[in-house]
């Protein structure tokens, strides 16, 4: 029952596609048919004579009981059985679909389908039981079924049908007993266990002088493969028979796999990872020389095929050299029989030329393994020669290209190069650090030293991109978080040093201007003329505006607004802006974005620079080092900038530039449009024209 269910399920998947019934539904249908007496054995389902009674009975049951599940399942099974029956045009194909693949799911053969029902029921006792037992033995996945004679002479004695040659035990094939292929242990034994049905003419004859050799495995449906390949385009006459070790016998290759591989080579190329994966899957099991050469004719053009033949010959010569040194080499059959040679490995020895059956019978398992491995290695070499990869050293991340796309191009080029596998990972990581965009380079340099593989670097960059964008604003936000604790530590230390036992912040003395004490505690004891005088700047008592200690630090503020006594604010956490970097203690440096708003075509529309806030400069000056070379400039009315060191030549921007200061959270202040000066100075300067337009004061920084 289980074997029949597997056969029917495979046939339904082949001919019904996605709507094929499940094994559970097929088993329920077979159980119902046996219960109703429509089938004496599950294998009777292959007989066309039982199809009409089953259809009528299930239709009547559906109308009476209203249950159409079994009828629907039977409709799909019936369609698959009819399609399989129509496709069997020769007895060799019938054997394949009968299940000679050793448990491989196969549609029914003509011996079970075309046999009349009256002939099956001559003797309802012993004869029917014998037929059922024979069918169950054919469908068993553990054993190979013995095909019936098709009316031809015996290949051993030459007599007509009915000879007893098959009853005698035949010698095992030459490679039986080898530990390389345990699944082939029962191939030769089945020949002597066929009962009264000898091997027919459809089985391949043994070569002269090798009468005891086992016949070759089942062949692929050549006509079907020709049709499949003809519809896809490649000019191929025939296809190889790929033999794999799946189960107790070798089985032919699916034509759809060959068709898909040919299409992949045309669309993806030979170096594609998809192509290599499919070729390795097809050649994962031993192939005959006939199989290998035909497969390469399909996927390679004339020139690559010629290169492959030469490379294959070199690989086979290496195998022969190793087999010559070691008599027990697997290609020599573990010391049994003659040593291997180039003619045997290429399928050119006596009885092998153009004869895949002879190759399957005469070649040893170790030779098949060497042939397949050499062919695959030669294919890899030809793929590198026929389609050379682009130089990985020239790959650079584009301005608008994502890091993932850049990594894909780089890894593909490095893996397709001639670099040894051990050197590919360090090369990829080094290219990440040098060929990526500047923001990503800075992020990778800050990565932990424990990241040692390309995958870890890629994951690190992607994780950081999710947290904050890889721009100057994002980096500014990250740096602000790191600097904030340092600033707070400095503030708290200064505050603790200037705070008395009462906890009040101690400021400058009104009398002497010294820190650390009040006016009442001043040792000079000098009092102002009017101790109750109110200051016009800070709104404090006991001093005037001229004596105010905040006079130099609050120019331009309205009196009495937002001021408090003491030298530090009362708030617990002072406002810290990343616009001022901490590497210059007394120089207010800010991060600025410059955007060219002109219509002149430029390579980079926006740039990021570091500039100095200088209230002593009349105008904004951009250094020649920070100014992009393709941004247009013009001669200014005043060709020089005058300072303490003398005059410096300058030019002026032809286009209007948008200037924006970056805050610590990555946001921008209100931008300003101006025509900055460009000069050869040591650093860019934001002058009073920019400070007034942006509303910036040095006291706020």
Swiss-Prot record:
Please tell me which stretches of this chain the record labels as motif LYPX(n)L motif: 180-184
Name of one Pfam family that matches: Retro_M
Q: Does the keyword Repeat apply?
A: yes
In alphabetical order, the GO MF annotations are:
aspartic-type endopeptidase activity; nucleic acid binding; structural constituent of virion; zinc ion binding
Q: Which GO terms describe its biological process?
A: proteolysis; viral procapsid maturation; viral translational frameshifting
GO CC annotation: what is one?
Answer: viral capsid
Q: Which UniProt keywords apply?
A: Aspartyl protease, Capsid protein, Host nucleus, Hydrolase, Metal-binding, Protease, Repeat, Viral capsid assembly, Viral capsid maturation, Viral matrix protein, Viral release from host cell, Virion, Zinc, Zinc-finger
**Annotated zinc fingers (CCHC-type), start-end:** 507-524, 533-550
Q: Where is this motif: Nuclear export signal?
A: 219-229
Short sequence motif named PPXY motif, residue ranges: 172-175
Q: Where is this motif: Nuclear/nucleolar localization signal?
A: 524-527
Query: Where is region (Involved in capsid protein dimerization) located?
Result: 217-259, 290-298, 351-362
Residue ranges of every copy of the Peptidase A2 domain listed in the record: 609-690
Q: In chain numbering, where does the site feature Cleavage fall?
A: 155-156, 166-167, 177-178, 239-240, 476-477, 479-480, 488-489, 577-578
Region described as Disordered: spans on this chain: 124-144, 544-571
| Basic and acidic residues bias spans | 124-141
Query: Where in the sequence is the active site?
Result: 614
E.C. no: 3.4.23.-
Task: Give the site residues for Involved in capsid protein dimerization upon acidification.
Answer: 418, 430
Q: Which InterPro entries match?
A: Aspartic_peptidase_AS, Gag_M, Matrix_HIV/RSV_N, Peptidase_A2_cat, Peptidase_aspartic_dom_sf, Primate_lentivir_Gag_pol-like, Retropepsin-like_cat_dom, Retropepsins
Copy the domain comment.
Answer: Capsid protein p27: Proton-driven dimerization of the C-terminus facilitates capsid assembly.
Protein name per its UniProtKB record:
Gag polyprotein
């Amino acid at each position: 029952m289980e074997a029949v269910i597997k056969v029917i399920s495979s046939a339904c998947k082949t001919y019904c596609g996605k709507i094929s019934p499940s094994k559970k539904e097929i088993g329920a249908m077979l159980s119902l048919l046996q219960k109703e007496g429509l089938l004496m054995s599950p294998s009777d389902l292959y007989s066309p004579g039982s199809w009409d009674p089953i259809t009528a009975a299930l239709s009547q049951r559906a109308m009476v009981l209203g249950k159409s599940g079994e009828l629907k399942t039977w409709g799909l099974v019936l369609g698959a059985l009819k399609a399989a029956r129509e496709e069997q045009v020769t007895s060799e194909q019938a054997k394949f679909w009968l299940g000679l693949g050793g448990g491989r799911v196969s549609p029914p053969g003509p011996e079970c389908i075309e046999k009349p029902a009256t002939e099956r029921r001559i003797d309802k006792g012993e004869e029917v039981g014998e037929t059922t037992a024979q069918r169950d033995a054919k469908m068993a996945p553990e054993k190979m079924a013995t095909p019936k004679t098709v009316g031809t002479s015996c290949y051993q004695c030459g007599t007509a049908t009915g000879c007893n040659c098959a009853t005698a035990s035949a010698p095992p094939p030459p490679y039986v007993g080898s530990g390389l292929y345990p699944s082939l242990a029962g191939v030769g034994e089945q020949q002597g266990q066929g009962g009264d049905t000898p091997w027919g003419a459809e089985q391949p004859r043994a070569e002269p002088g090798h009468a005891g050799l086992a016949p070759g495995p089942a062949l692929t449906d050549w006509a079907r493969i020709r049709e499949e390949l003809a519809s896809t385009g490649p000019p191929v006459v025939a296809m190889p028979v790929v033999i794999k070790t799946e189960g107790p016998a070798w089985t032919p290759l699916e034509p759809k796999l060959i068709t898909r591989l040919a299409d992949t080579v045309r669309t993806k190329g030979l170096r594609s990872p998809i192509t290599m994966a499919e070729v390795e899957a097809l050649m994962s099991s031993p192939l005959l020389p006939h199989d290998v050469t035909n497969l390469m004719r399909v996927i390679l053009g004339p020139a690559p095929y010629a290169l492959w033949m030469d490379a294959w010959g070199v690989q086979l010569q290496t195998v022969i050299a190793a087999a010559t040194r070691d008599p027990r080499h697997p290609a020599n059959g573990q010391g049994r029989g003659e040593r291997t040679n180039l003619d045997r490995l290429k399928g050119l020895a006596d009885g092998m030329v153009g004869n895949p059956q002879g190759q399957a019978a005469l070649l040893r398992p170790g030779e098949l393994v060497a042939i397949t491995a050499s062919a695959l290695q030669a294919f890899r070499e030809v793929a590198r020669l026929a389609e050379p990869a682009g130089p990985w050293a020239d790959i650079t991340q584009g301005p608008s290209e994502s890091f993932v796309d850049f990594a894909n191009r780089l890894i593909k080029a490095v893996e397709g190069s001639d670099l040894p596998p051990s050197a590919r990972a360090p090369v990829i990581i080094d290219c990440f650090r040098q060929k990526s965009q500047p923001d990503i380079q800075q992020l990778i340099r800050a990565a932990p030293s424990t990241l040692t593989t390309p995958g870890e670097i890629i994951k690190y960059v992607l994780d950081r991109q999710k947290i904050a964008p890889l721009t100057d604003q994002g980096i500014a936000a990250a740096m602000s978080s790191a600097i904030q604790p340092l600033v707070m530590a400095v503030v708290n230390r200064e505050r603790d040093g200037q705070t008395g036992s009462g906890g009040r912040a101690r400021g400058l003395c009104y009398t002497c201007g010294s820190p650390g004490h009040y006016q009442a505690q001043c040792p000079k004891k000098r009092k102002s003329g009017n101790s109750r005088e109110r200051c016009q700047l800070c709104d404090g008592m006991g001093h005037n505006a001229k004596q105010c200690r905040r006079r130099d630090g609050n120019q331009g503020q309205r009196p009495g607004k937002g001021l408090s006594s003491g030298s530090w604010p009362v708030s617990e956490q002072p406002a810290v802006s990343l616009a001022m970097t901490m590497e210059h203690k007394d120089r207010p440096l800010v991060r600025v974005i410059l955007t060219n708003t002109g219509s002149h075509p430029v390579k980079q529309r926006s740039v990021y620079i570091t500039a100095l806030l200088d209230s002593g400069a009349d105008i904004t000056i951009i250094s020649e080092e920070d100014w992009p070379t393709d941004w247009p400039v013009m001669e200014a009315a005043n060709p020089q900038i005058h300072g303490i060191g003398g005059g410096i030549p300058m030019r002026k921007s032809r286009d209007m530039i948008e200037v924006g200061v970056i805050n610590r959270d990555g946001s921008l202040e209100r931008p300003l449009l101006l025509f900055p000066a460009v000069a050869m100075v040591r650093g860019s300067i934001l002058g009073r024209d920019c400070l007034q337009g942006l509303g910036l004061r040095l006291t706020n920084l």
